[in-house]
Amino acid sequence: MEEQVHGRARRESQGDERFFGPYQILYRASLRNPLPGAQWTGITTRIAERLFEEKMVDAVLTMAPDPNDAWRPVPVLVRSKEGLTNCRGMRMGYAPLLSLIEPAIAQGVERLAVIGIPCQVYALRALERELKLKKLYVIGTPCSDNTTTERFHEFLELLSPAPETITYLEFCADYHVEIRFRDGSKKRIPFLLLPLSKLPSDFFPLTCRTCVDYTNVLSDITVGYMGGEGAQWLIVRNDAGMELLDLLGAEVQLSSPGSAGRRHGPVKGFMENTRRAAGGLPLRSMPNWLRPLVGWLMPKIGPRGLEFARARVEMKAIETVIHLKREEPKRMKSMIPEHVWALTKPYGITRQDDGSTRQDD
């Protein structure tokens, strides 16, 4: 569908397209005046606000928090700039975003912007021609894994004795998770010190563990953080995406994304642990006394910037092959695109592992 949306498929030999999909340009970015309550600086929200200010859309379809649970996503059709304020921030869980499209069209919406994660955007693009909208803008955010809101609350309980006071959580590009609390305090936890081994094996469903579209390749513009080295990361994919970015003008600070470190070692280690976990074996873990030291070293010597983003994309590709081979080998040929095999090949995972013959890892 890349060619249908962008006019061409990714070019394996062009820049980083084999990792991130078709794009015109990559940026490291941040709003000069960050929006209060935003997950990062608020670029996604501000683009949507500017669409209303310039009268370019009739509505924005996005997620808002459930009134009874701030972490639970609820689809909303926003009809004004002011309505976007409540939509800032991150939520965790499943919600039928696209269920509001037909009601929106019935209400007379002809020009629509949608803010969504990859699985939502993929379904949207599949329906796009049938919708017959006069204009559709798609602002995508990356997504690595999702879980139910109930399971996410279980995770929060492992991070704090008072999980109900947590108001913000983000996996940062410096190998830390940042948590913010109701009283304004903050806590940063190195990835290696997270209690991931205490999570149930089905915490992330198979559909997420076998998703190969981390970077939301069918959006007009992807707004994330993985390649931003502490700032936000923009993937401008087509002319519509550039039109959206141009709406910010001098409000946004742009620079070329950096890249440092080497990803092969961390990705290989991830592959070995994923194979063990998929086979029901205990994960190999380092001694507890060594974890703080390695957690301190990783932001300094591990992959950073675009190299970190490349590593995450390769990890998702490897994870997809391993889990499909283990649980749904007959689906491998239809669920694994050609470019994924190119990403896994440097790690010894080739099309010979496509499930035509079932083998144990």
Residue positions per predicted region:
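Gly/Ser/Thr-rich loops at beta-strand to alpha-helix junctions
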Residues: W40-I43, P67, V114-L124, D145-T147
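N-terminal extension/subdomain marker
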Residues: M1-R46, R50-M56, R304-R331, E338, ...
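Long, compositionally biased charged/polar accessory segments in the mid-to-C-terminal portions
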Residues: V57-D58, E164-G355, D361
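Short, flexible loop segments at boundaries between secondary-structure elements
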Residues: Y137-E157, S256-P266
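Active-site glycine-rich loop that binds ribose-phosphate moieties when present
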Residues: G89-P103, S144-E164
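Short, surface-exposed basic-aromatic patches at helix termini and helix-loop junctions that form
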Residues: A106, R125-Y137, L156-S160
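Short cysteine clusters
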Residues: M1, C119, C208-C211
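Glycine-rich phosphate-binding "P-loop"
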Residues: R72-S99
